[in-house]
Each structure stands twice: as C-alpha cells, then as structure tokens.
Amino acid sequence: MKLLISLIAMTALSMSVHAAETAAPTTPAPAPPLKPVRFILVGDSTMANTSGYGDAFCARVNRANTCINLAKGGRSSGSFRAEGRWDEVQGLLRGAAAYRATYVLIQFGHNDQPGKPGRSTDLKTEFPVNMARYAQEVKALGGVPVLVTPLTRRSFTDKVLENNLQPWADVIRATAAAQKAPLLDLNAESYAAVQAMGEDEADTLAMAPRPDKVAEAAAASGKVEVAGAAKSAFDRTHLGAKGAAYFSHMVMDEVKREIPDIAGQFKPESEQ
C-alpha cells in the first residue's frame, strides 16, 4: 500500500514538473520609454532667431520642444555670460533628469572681434579661456558641450571670399581638442560652400534683397553689430529664411557626422 501511494505521488510530481516546463513563458514587462535627447543653442545673431540658423535647426529636430535656441544677437563669449544669460543654460542643465542627454552647441567669435566696445575679447588671453570655461561647466553639470566655429561672413574681394574669422575658428578648434569635446567646424564648411557658390548666389542668403548700391548697404549694416537683434536689412553676415535653411541643414549634417549616436534625433529629409 505504501509503495502504491509513493508511486502515485511520484507520478503526480512528474506531471506537475512537465506542466510547468510546457507552460507558456511569461511576457516580460515592457521597457520604459527611452528618454529624449535635448539641444540647447548658445551664440550670437548668426545663430539667433530671425537673423541666424538656430530656429531652422530646431525645426529639423524630431521633437521641437527638445531644442531650445538661447542665442542672442550682438553677444560675445564674454558678454553672454556677463549679462547672466549663461545662468539660464546652467539652470536647464541642472533640471535635465527628463532627458537622456543634453547637447549644448556653443558658437561665438563674431562679436569677440576688435572694435565692439563692451563685447570684444582678447583673442589670446580671454577668448580661449571663455570657450574652455563654457565647455567645462557644461560637462560638470552632466551635459555635452559641442563647440561650433563661427559661421563665415559672405564678403568677396576680386571673387575671393574673405575669412577674417579664421583666428577665432582656430581657437575653437584647439579648445575642442583640449576639452575632448565634439567640434562642428562650421567656419571651414560654410567658407568652402560660400566660396564655391560665388557672390551673387551668396547674396541671396541675406535677410533682405541686395540693393543697387550694394557696397554701401553691406558696409553700413554689417560692419558693427549692435548688442541686440539684427535689423532686417541687407548685409553679408546675417541670414534670411533661405540662408537659415541652408546653414541649418549644414549644421545638422555636421552633428550627424561628428556625433553619430544622435543622428536619429532629426526628422527625415522628406519632413523637413
């Protein structure tokens, strides 16, 4: 009798084990949604809204609310901080828990050049320090600094494009290397593109149509940028809608190339 009971118990146990082995596997819990990537743009009028490529760049990002354009016309690497504008960037970085990563694109140079009282910075002793400090502070707050060399101006002499921003671009290249930060060499790429298209085509990228007295107009409106939004007039520094679209696409392509991990953060070409 005891033997029979033991056999019955063993059979029941075997059937239970077999049933457990053949039962449908449990469905794993769904993975939490991936946090978005955020972009913050810091710079001067060539990046700012209405006069630069920044808003057009943000429009190419998958989620418009994850791209914040804080660039401001007339600002240099020194005055942007002196006015307290960098405080806003740091505040955003401190509140970055909702984002997988925050990339801060930093572009200065135009207003760091000599002849702009209250904004010009010394190329050797101030500008490199300012750019390095921006990069270091972004990293300290958990962000990713992306240094951008200044957008070229579009003034030609005897069919050759001038590049008086080259020294500032060189400093940014060196700073990016020293800080191990991604570099978008917009100066080199925009210079090559504008030189290739020539003066007439380059002038179509401006904020307003080229007037008959082009030399006087360009000199009057583009030589010294006041500390504010650029006026809607022809010059060879600022950008209209066509110029913003053109150079924002260039910057987007540079981001995809230099930071391939976030190449998927932009809309398909057909939707841009």
Regions inferred by a protein language model and the residue ranges of each:
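Serine-esterase "nucleophile elbow" of acetyl-processing enzymes
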Residues: 20-79, 87-99, 104
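Alpha-helical cap/lid subdomain in secreted, periplasmic
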Residues: 88-271
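A generic, residue-level signal for flexible/boundary positions that often mark functional hotspots
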Residues: 11, 41, 231-233
